[in-house]
């Protein structure tokens, strides 16, 4: 539970700059684009895979496409890039107002990854500990936002 209202949290998780600010993996470097406002909105995240130490991919860009959107309640997205299509996984957040703040659930679903991609990597790429850390960073970021 984050002691803030859902609108303040949603403002961070729907904004490309917010994605970079709360990333615990170290891969997200910067962003280009406007905050999401609807399904099919897109923005670009400039990445560096070297922080994971698993593949020598260097710097690259991904396009984030919003796949689910309910203002101040729910957002999901998939990623694709110049050298790779969306592979069937998605990320997101579910926000539920509760006494004293908002219950935030991180969504990270790899269950529909296309079989042809499974041999190409270790799934999921982002560890559970990094996802949990992102929630802590999200709380700190929301508290620091005026």
Q: Residue ranges of each PLM-predicted region?
A:
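Short, low-complexity Ser/Thr-rich regulatory SLiMs
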Residues: 68, 93-99
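Hydrophobic ligand-binding cavity/cleft-lining segments
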Residues: 1-39
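A short, polar/proline- and glycine-enriched secondary-structure boundary/capping micro-motif
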Residues: 55-57, 86-90, 114-121
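Hydrophobic pocket/interface hotspot
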Residues: 8-13, 19, 43, 66, ...
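Generic structural detector for well-ordered beta-strands
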Residues: 1-3, 65, 78, 94
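A conserved amphipathic terminal alpha-helix motif
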Residues: 103, 107-146
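Glycine-rich portal/gate segments that line the openings of hydrophobic small-molecule binding cavities
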Residues: 31-83, 136-146
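Short, solvent-exposed aromatic-acidic interface loops
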Residues: 78-87, 107-114
């Amino acid at each position: 539970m984050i002691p803030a209202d859902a609108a303040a949290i949603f403002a961070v998780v729907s904004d490309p700059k917010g994605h970079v600010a709360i990333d615990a993996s170290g891969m997200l470097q910067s962003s280009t684009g406007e905050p999401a406002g609807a399904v099919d909105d897109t923005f670009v995240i400039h990445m560096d895979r070297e922080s994971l130490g698993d593949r020598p991919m260097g710097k690259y860009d991904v396009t984030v496409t919003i796949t689910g959107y309910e203002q101040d309640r729910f957002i999901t997205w998939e990623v694709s890039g110049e050298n790779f299509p969306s592979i069937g996984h998605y990320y997101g957040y579910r926000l539920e107002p509760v006494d004293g703040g908002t219950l935030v659930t991180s969504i990270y679903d790899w269950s529909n990854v296309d079989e042809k991609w499974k041999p190409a990597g270790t799934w999921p790429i982002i560890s559970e500990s990094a996802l949990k850390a992102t929630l802590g960073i999200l709380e700190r970021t929301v508290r620091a936002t005026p």
